[in-house]
Structures are given as structure tokens and as C-alpha cells.
Amino acid sequence: QANMKQYNEQEVAQMELAQKAMNIRKKELDADQVKVVERLNQTWDNFTEEQKQQLQQDQTEWFEKRDVDCKVISQKSVYQMTDSEKETYQKQSQYWDEALRAQDQQLQYTKCFNQKTNERIVYLNNVFN
């Protein structure tokens, strides 16, 4: 009985730690997302009207593709990842419940969103060079 209580307390403590680690990572990714969207907008604003017209269709298609790609990528279960692919907060995944798994999906989406947006900024900066 005492062992079970101790085990449950450890389990709860590990879950709280996992949640804290996830909250910290969410804050970082959300801050990155704000910056990267701002940079993308600035990059776009630097184009002439003519350049914007040339790129408009491509840009619209890119937004859609980024969204779909990231939704697919974010559905990959942490259990399908190798240790080297896992972020620090994911190494506690054995203590996750459904809510934490759902939150991980959101984080993976944001991470992908940021990465693809950064790649797009690089592309746009070179498109007319």
C-alpha cells in the first residue's frame, strides 16, 4: 500500500515535470513564431507591387502547403521518433496523458511552422537575385 502511494506520487511528480518542460518549450516556440511571422511580413513588404503580383499565387499556395505539411508532421507520435529526434521535453513522454500528447502535437505543428517559414524567408530573399 505504501509502495503504491509512493509510486503514484512519483508518477504525479514526473507528470508535473513533463508539463513544466512542455510549457517552457511552448513559450519558446510561440515567441519564435511571432518573430518569424514578423520577418516574413517584412520580407514581403520589401517587394515592389509588381514583384508581389508575380509572387502572389505562389505565396498563397505555399501558405496552404505549409499548413498541410505541418499538420501531417505534427501527427507523428513521439513513440515513433528516435532518441536523437526527440526534444528534451519529449524524453518524459512515458508520463504523458492525452492532454499532454495533444499539446505535443501543437508544439510539433508550431515547430514545423517556424522552420518552414524561415525557409520561405530565405527563398523570398533570393527569388529576385
What are these regions (language model features)?
Residues Q1-N129:
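N-terminal alpha-helical modules
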